[in-house]
């Protein structure tokens, strides 16, 4: 039997079965009046794909169809399968199964309301993203068929920003966001905000900056840097937030006429 459910690890000697992984999944349903619990499953590496998402799909298809989780691209592009694996926020489609630990603990993203099992409610997260107006705002005629020119140098300013997939791994790892998620925008949304602030094609740089000048929206960041450590795309939200603060400081000290894109 290569895939089965266990009630306790004591029924399996994992030290003698190195090709097996014990998967412990957090379970809870917000629609039911039950306390959270853990379901434990065993997956054989011999007939399962190499990543955690493969194991979750195998468990759902062959053992327990009630296990709920999000997934889509399987390539680290969409960010749908963001969960907490062994205490670290990551994408299930990027985290390998063949790690040193025989037991793999799988939780939903921390400090976000759980809908069911590994599925969290991202309503507030997306509402905050909408708040920064994440689209190009230009005074040029939008009906024109001619593209808005951007130099190669200006394009380079977007590197390390546009790659963000809004998986929420960074925001869910930030203690400041845990305590102030209703006011603090969090590292993911602030990184996205900076992506539009530095875009040379956008004409609303000043208003975008001023909209972040708030003791909670921006300044709850205390450079703990969990966001940078956990980002599956290897981005640096902490550095980006510091850059936003610096630009606002320059604006206050040197005045609005300063080149905000420098």
From Swiss-Prot:
Sites binding a ubiquinone sit at 179
**Subcellular location(s) per record:** Mitochondrion inner membrane
Q: What does the record give under GO molecular function?
A: 2 iron, 2 sulfur cluster binding; 3 iron, 4 sulfur cluster binding; 4 iron, 4 sulfur cluster binding; electron transfer activity; metal ion binding; succinate dehydrogenase (quinone) activity
Cofactor: binding details: Binds 1 [2Fe-2S] cluster.
Query: What EC designation does it have?
Result: 1.3.5.1
- Binding-site positions, [4Fe-4S] cluster: 164, 167, 170, 231
Q: In which pathway does it act?
A: Carbohydrate metabolism; tricarboxylic acid cycle; fumarate from succinate (eukaryal route): step 1/1
Which cofactors is this protein said to need? [2Fe-2S] cluster; [3Fe-4S] cluster; [4Fe-4S] cluster
Q: Tell me the subunit arrangement.
A: Component of complex II composed of four subunits: a flavoprotein (FP), an iron-sulfur protein (IP), and a cytochrome b composed of a large and a small subunit.
Q: Which NCBIfam families match?
A: dhsB, PRK05950.1
The similarity annotation says: Belongs to the succinate dehydrogenase/fumarate reductase iron-sulfur protein family.
**What name does the UniProt record give this protein?**
Succinate dehydrogenase [ubiquinone] iron-sulfur subunit
* Source organism of the structure: Cyanidium caldarium
Gene this chain is encoded by:
SDH2
